[in-house]
């Protein structure tokens, strides 16, 4: 089967290639991801949930115990394991793009950035404030702004950028599904290299 043959179902044309959803906390990765997985006949995994299960504690507890560096090391190990599997839609943690080595695994799949404006992110995060250690403390809006400034250029290296606001998760999922065929490569085409 040829991955660019439009007569084949999209899930088959992907040939098990994983989809990695990247974007800021609150961008909708864990909401859109299961819809994509269902449409493609894939399995959905939330990387933060896998990390929590592996560590035996919550993400805030990992940050408190091991700091951000310890969390990023565990996140890297989980990504390395997940990249060995196939037919997954993975909602990654918002900071996964900040570790250059992670791009090697991410580039083995299709990287999709769910982009949300800063004001909308703040609104969403205020509505659901739990478990966000990087926003803890004084001035969460200032912290969010700083994280966005650092991460947006990294998110911009994704294969696909999708605005994830102003419509429901099912509409966002459908737009991603419509754009995926344009990202499929013919056999023998050069692979995208890590940044």
Swiss-Prot record:
- Where, in this chain's numbering, is ATP bound? 26-31, 132
Q: What is its EC number?
A: 2.7.1.71
What transmembrane ranges does the database entry give? none
Q: What GO MF annotations does this protein's record show?
A: ATP binding; magnesium ion binding; shikimate kinase activity
Q: Name one GO biological process term.
A: aromatic amino acid family biosynthetic process
Catalytic activity field: shikimate + ATP = 3-phosphoshikimate + ADP + H(+)
A single cellular component GO annotation: cytosol
Cofactor note as given: Binds 1 Mg(2+) ion per subunit.
The record's family statement is:
Belongs to the shikimate kinase family.
Main function: Catalyzes the specific phosphorylation of the 3-hydroxyl group of shikimic acid using ATP as a cosubstrate.
What protein am I looking at? Shikimate kinase
Q: Which organism is it from?
A: Synechococcus sp. (strain RCC307)
């Amino acid at each position: 089967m040829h991955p660019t043959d439009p007569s084949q179902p999209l899930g088959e044309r992907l040939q098990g290639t994983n989809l990695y959803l990247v974007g800021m906390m609150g961008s909708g990765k864990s909401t859109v991801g299961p819809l994509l997985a269902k449409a493609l006949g894939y399995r959905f995994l939330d990387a933060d949930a896998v990390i929590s299960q592996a560590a035996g504690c919550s993400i805030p507890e990992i940050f408190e115990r091991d700091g951000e560096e310890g969390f990023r090391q565990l996140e890297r190990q989980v990504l390395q394991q997940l990249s060995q599997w196939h037919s997954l839609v993975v909602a990654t943690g918002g900071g996964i793009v900040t570790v250059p080595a992670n791009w090697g695994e991410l580039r083995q799949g299709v990287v999709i950035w769910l982009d949300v404006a800063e004001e909308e992110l703040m609104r969403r995060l205020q509505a659901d404030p739990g478990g966000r250690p990087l926003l803890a403390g004084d001035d969460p809006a200032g912290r969010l702004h700083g994280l966005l400034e650092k991460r947006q250029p990294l998110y911009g290296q994704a294969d696909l950028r999708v605005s994830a606001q102003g419509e429901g998760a099912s509409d966002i999922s459908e737009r991603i599904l419509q754009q995926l065929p344009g990202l499929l490569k013919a056999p023998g085409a050069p692979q995208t290299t890590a940044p």
